[in-house]
Amino acid sequence: MSSLYASVSAIATTAASSAGGASARDLGIAGGVSGFAIIVLLMGGLGHRSEMVTTLTWFERFSERVSGQPAWASLPCGLAIISLLTAVFGLYWDVSLHVDRGRDPGVFSNPSHIFILAGLYGIFAAGWFSICLSREERADRPGPTAIRITRDWYAPLGGLMMCGAGLFSLLGFPLDDFWHRLFGQDVTLWGPTHLMLIGGAAMTLVGIAIIQVEVRRAVRSSGLPDREYGWVRHLRHVWLPGGLLVGMSTFQGEFDWGVPQFQLIYHPMLIMLAAGVTLVAARVWLGPGRALGAVAFFIAMRGILALLVHDSLGQSLPHFPLYIAEALIVEGVAFVVAVKRPLLFGAVCGALIGTVGLAAEWGWTHVWMPIPWPREMLAETIVFGLAMAVAASLIGAWMGSRLGSERIPHSIPLRWAAVASSVAVAAMLAFPLFTQSGTDLSARVALRTVDAGPKRTAIATVTLSPRNGADHAKWLTATAWQGGGLITDRLRRVSEGVYETTRPVPLYGDWKTMIRLHKGNAILGLPIYAPADPAIPLPGVAAPPRFDRPFFSDHELLQREARTQAAWITWGAYLTVLVCTLGLLAMLAWGIHRIGVTAGRRRLPHPGVAGPPPPREPEPEPDPEFDTSLPEPVWPAHFPTYAGR
């Protein structure tokens, strides 16, 4: 543990050495390792199909024995789970490091990046293995949803989607470095390329869900007995929707640490979006109790991540919502409205999630969130929260009905409701992006020193001009970060227009200390102290005992490293990320739709042939005296295997 703390301290001392892209050395190492790993992966998969490489055979049989599923589903899903856990741990550690220490000089200077890269590569590898492990000569080969690659090679739909989502995330890494070179290092979770990394990994769960539907159908239509262990099935029904809930909650990270750089209304909107999509889909697709199981898995995973990042690694604590009320609502509605009427079920769930569930999350923010939702935001929270919950629940009902389409009738109105809801969600997420930049607000700050030593701290008294400048504000905080920790202190009102910190704030070293104000659609900041940064370059901000300063856009304070480019470069960069994102979303929608419309189709006895496959000529019996082949392994009866079918 001491060596781990030493490595983190080393990051802190070298963090300011770069404010653009990674060094040529880091790029060379990353490119070489990634290229070599991709080549090995592709050659290994193709070699396994041609039976020239047998390395995967042991893993193939092992995954079948422990799960009871065919290897083209069990091995990729197991690898994807491990990879997602690795990536999400790296993500939360990485965000905490940036909040506490600031930017890093390169890819390999931050140990959390290794976990993220390994996890994303594992996701891509899982999808590729699923594509390569499906064999047409097996009775349990993928069914009619499979995508034809060659005459006798059909890839599982879920495997292709996992591979695509992993590739989308991996593409975010080189684009992120390119973005830093153009616009500086964006120390925010919601940087465009950062969202690519998060979004691709989170949406991998959709590919896993589809491949699980495919394997159930394939085993059923093959006439083979279902040998999936009961504990595997029950665990899958918990971790799959729970994992999707964890993935969708990562987008709320701007608010989990208490340093949001976007409007606070996003927080309830994103919570309602995750609850509506995930919990409604889980109940419609998987049956009773699955929404509660998903929330239990979510709380366990996020709790473990919080303990690892905060208690074990000594970084800032990431907070999270509960979703318990929303899960109870979904399970309760199912007693009144049949899930076989998904349109009505989704609408009722959305209405209750957007009212009762929203009220529960409102209360939870006042218990365990760094920035609670104030009553000044009540009206817009009700409007946007309710609208988002209904739209998300209709999308979740559509997803659940597609994944469980063998027992839930198709609904054309539900399909169009989901399309309209998707457009509404996009519009609602885009609306709060626009913020007010100009302001005439200023403040006089008086600092009462608490510790006058080299680690100077002080109580700040802030007098606003005009005095009503913070009336109806959504937050008014003193924030100090990137100096070895994080402080988010909600100011105490002393009198009209006069506010005071409730604890001393740091005014030394690498700390960046400021007053932050969010009122209406304006997010403003006033610097109190900041060190000089020659890498950008920017001069330091001194903290005399008394001073007057204006407020301005707090993006200039929180993203000191950011720089502007010509308009065509900026629009071109954003358009590139947008096209990639729309491609991922289109792939997900197409995959979910395809798994639904093929539910009633029967698989042909042999792909591409309208009748039974041609009979094979009998192979000659081997001569026992000259037979040098290895005997087939004999597994215990309780370890079923699909190998050789």
Give the ranges of each region predicted by the language model.
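Hydrophobic cores of alpha-helical transmembrane segments in multi-pass inner/ER membrane proteins
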Residues: A30-G47, I114-C132, L195-V213, M269-L286, ...
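Membrane-interface helix-loop-helix junctions at boundaries between adjacent transmembrane segments
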Residues: V107, T145-M162, L170-V238, G253-V259
